Protein backbone atom coordinates (compact mmCIF):
# COMPACT_ATOMS: atom_id res chain seq x y z
CA UNK A 1 0.00 0.00 0.00
CA UNK A 2 1.54 3.32 -1.04
CA UNK A 3 1.90 5.92 1.63
CA UNK A 4 2.70 9.60 1.48
CA UNK A 5 4.19 11.67 4.25
CA UNK A 6 2.67 15.11 4.33
CA UNK A 7 5.33 17.78 4.49
CA UNK A 8 5.06 20.80 6.72
CA UNK A 9 2.67 23.42 5.32
CA UNK A 10 1.92 21.24 2.30
CA UNK A 11 -1.54 21.73 0.81
CA UNK A 12 -3.87 18.75 0.90
CA UNK A 13 -4.32 18.82 -2.88
CA UNK A 14 -0.60 18.38 -3.48
CA UNK A 15 -0.39 15.46 -1.04
CA UNK A 16 -3.44 13.84 -2.63
CA UNK A 17 -1.90 14.22 -6.09
CA UNK A 18 1.33 12.58 -4.87
CA UNK A 19 -0.68 9.73 -3.34
CA UNK A 20 -2.62 9.16 -6.56
CA UNK A 21 0.61 9.11 -8.54
CA UNK A 22 2.16 6.55 -6.19
CA UNK A 23 -0.96 4.37 -6.49
CA UNK A 24 -0.71 4.51 -10.28
CA UNK A 25 2.95 3.49 -10.17
CA UNK A 26 2.12 0.59 -7.84
CA UNK A 27 -0.56 -0.62 -10.28
CA UNK A 28 -3.42 -0.49 -7.79
CA UNK A 29 -5.88 1.27 -10.08
CA UNK A 30 -5.35 -1.12 -12.98
CA UNK A 31 -5.65 -4.09 -10.60
CA UNK A 32 -8.97 -2.74 -9.28
CA UNK A 33 -10.31 -2.31 -12.79
CA UNK A 34 -9.21 -5.83 -13.71
CA UNK A 35 -10.93 -7.31 -10.65
CA UNK A 36 -14.09 -5.21 -10.91
CA UNK A 37 -15.98 -7.98 -12.70
CA UNK A 38 -15.55 -11.73 -12.66
CA UNK A 39 -13.66 -13.04 -15.64
CA UNK A 40 -14.30 -16.60 -16.73
CA UNK A 41 -11.18 -18.74 -16.99
CA UNK A 42 -11.79 -19.25 -20.71
CA UNK A 43 -11.92 -15.48 -21.25
CA UNK A 44 -8.72 -15.04 -19.28
CA UNK A 45 -6.95 -17.67 -21.38
CA UNK A 46 -8.22 -16.09 -24.58
CA UNK A 47 -7.12 -12.61 -23.46
CA UNK A 48 -3.66 -13.87 -22.54
CA UNK A 49 -3.33 -15.75 -25.83
CA UNK A 50 -4.25 -12.72 -27.93
CA UNK A 51 -1.82 -10.58 -25.93
CA UNK A 52 0.95 -13.11 -26.57
CA UNK A 53 0.17 -13.11 -30.30
CA UNK A 54 0.27 -9.30 -30.37
CA UNK A 55 3.61 -9.30 -28.56
CA UNK A 56 4.99 -11.87 -31.00
CA UNK A 57 3.87 -9.85 -34.01
CA UNK A 58 5.27 -6.68 -32.51
CA UNK A 59 8.63 -8.27 -31.80
CA UNK A 60 8.77 -9.73 -35.33
CA UNK A 61 8.12 -6.32 -36.82
CA UNK A 62 10.91 -4.76 -34.80
CA UNK A 63 13.38 -7.54 -35.67
CA UNK A 64 12.72 -7.36 -39.43
CA UNK A 65 13.76 -3.71 -39.71
Swiss-Prot record:
Q: Which domain of life is it from?
A: Bacteria
Keyword annotations for this protein? Answer: Ribonucleoprotein, Ribosomal protein
Task: State the disulfide connectivity.
Answer: none
A Gene Ontology biological process noted in the UniProt record is: translation
InterPro entries annotated for this entry? Ribosomal_bS21 (IPR001911), Ribosomal_bS21_CS (IPR018278), Ribosomal_bS21_sf (IPR038380)
GO CC terms of this entry: ribonucleoprotein complex; ribosome
Annotated GO MF terms? structural constituent of ribosome
Q: Enumerate the NCBIfam families for this protein.
A: S21p
UniProt lists the family membership as follows: Belongs to the bacterial ribosomal protein bS21 family.
Which HAMAP family does the UniProt entry name for this protein?
Answer: Ribosomal_bS21 (MF_00358)
Protein name per Swiss-Prot or TrEMBL:
Small ribosomal subunit protein bS21B
According to its UniProt entry, this protein's organism is: Francisella tularensis subsp. holarctica (strain LVS)
Amino acid sequence: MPSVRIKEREPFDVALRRFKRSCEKAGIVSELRRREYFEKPTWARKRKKTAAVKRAHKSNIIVKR
